[in-house]
Regions:
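N-terminal loops that bind phosphate or other acidic moieties
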Residues: 2-348
Length: 348
């Protein structure tokens, strides 16, 4: 239990002490229903696992996804000044404008798959500080941004897909992973939005400089977030926390979104029990990060765009899992004997 110091992060840490849990009784009823559906048990593979996951978090035998959204957070990064990206920082605003005009990849996927889209522009004209020179955020600002992200599920949603946009944010994510998990910085750095060898080397150098500068803060995941993260990453931490409080499942997108999840996983792995990981990014270190969190992604399509595009595709799988489980006929419907109990190893 954290000591009460009156510091902004104490309010955030207090939320970790009151975690909602899945309804195991509802999950058990869903498992029994699954055993009675008109198919060989297990024949829908991971869709069956997802359906039981949803049943537990929704607390019902027949889960439904009717109000899914993509929550897309955009932020800018002071470390961009270190020459770590081929793209000017203004592209972040350009892409936010494009999200609003329905011209980006994520807009097409949301329209196709029936997903709402909420775009959050996080003070793009005031990038977080350059972490090679000072912490990206102060504690008050970081905590306030986490709290802002907690509002993303306001209005009632039943599935949240997280996405992001921010020139330079793969560098911030790589720094977070390196700070959380250690190892060679080079192993956490990839091409981002098309970095060449020189830019990749500058990413590595910037992260090493930041790790040395903030060495005294590396034993606290929230401090790591504060020192290296962007506002979009901090806000996504908040969304994951608030979704847990409301028992709303979360779909984690790729490399950058996973860095927000990693901060929480390092605090307590159970903080991610309501999360599904959408896909393995083509960003080289993403598989390594997933392994560090003990997570398996649903898809591996070689994608590395961000924007929540991988999460949007995975949401289609989640919706499919709910629809098949909840809508299919059962053995009893066609006059066959019901399965009335499950072996202990199949009850969950």
């Amino acid at each position: 239990v954290p000591t009460a110091t009156g510091l902004p992060f104490d309010d955030i840490r207090a939320l970790f002490e009151r975690l909602t849990q899945p309804d195991l009784e509802a999950r058990g009823r869903a498992a029994l229903r699954n055993a009675n559906l008109l198919k060989p048990t297990g024949s829908l593979g991971e869709l069956e696992d997802i359906a039981l996951f949803l049943a537990g978090w929704q607390g019902v035998e027949k889960p439904q996804i009717t109000r899914p959204i993509v929550a897309l957070f955009a932020g800018n990064h002071g470390v961009h000044a270190q020459g770590i990206s081929r793209w000017p920082m203004e592209i972040t605003q350009t892409m936010v404008d494009m999200f609003m005009q329905s011209g980006a990849a994520i807009n097409q996927l949301c329209a196709l798959h029936g997903l709402g889209l909420k775009v959050f522009d996080l003070a793009l004209d005031m990038p977080v500080h350059d972490f090679t020179e000072e912490p990206a955020m102060d504690e008050k600002g970081c905590a306030a941004t986490i709290a802002f992200g907690m509002e993303a599920i306001a209005g009632g949603v039943d599935l949240v897909c997280l996405g992001e946009m921010g020139i330079g944010n793969t560098t911030a994510a790589s720094a977070i992973y390196a700070a959380l998990y250690g190892g060679d910085v080079e192993d956490w750095v990839g091409d981002g939005a098309g970095a060449d060898d020189d830019q990749r080397a500058r990413k590595v150098a910037a992260i090493k400089k930041g790790l040395a500068l903030h060495a005294s803060s590396l034993n606290d995941p929230l401090e790591i977030l504060r020192c290296f993260g962007g506002r979009e990453i901090a806000a996504m931490v908040g969304t994951i926390i608030s979704a847990r409080a409301e028992r709303v499942p979360v779909v984690i997108d790729g490399f950058v979104v996973s860095s927000a999840a990693a901060v929480l996983h390092k605090i307590d792995p159970a903080l991610l029990d309501h999360c599904l990981f959408a896909h393995v990014s083509a960003e080289q270190a993403h598989q390594k990060a997933l392994g560090a969190m003990g997570q398996k992604a649903l898809l591996n399509l070689g994608m590395r765009l961000g924007e929540g595009t991988g999460a949007a595709l995975a949401a289609m799988l989640v919706k499919s899992a709910a629809s098949t489980h909840s809508g299919m006929a059962t053995f009893a419907d066609i006059g066959l004997p019901e399965v009335t109990s499950l072996p202990a190893d199949q009850e969950s």
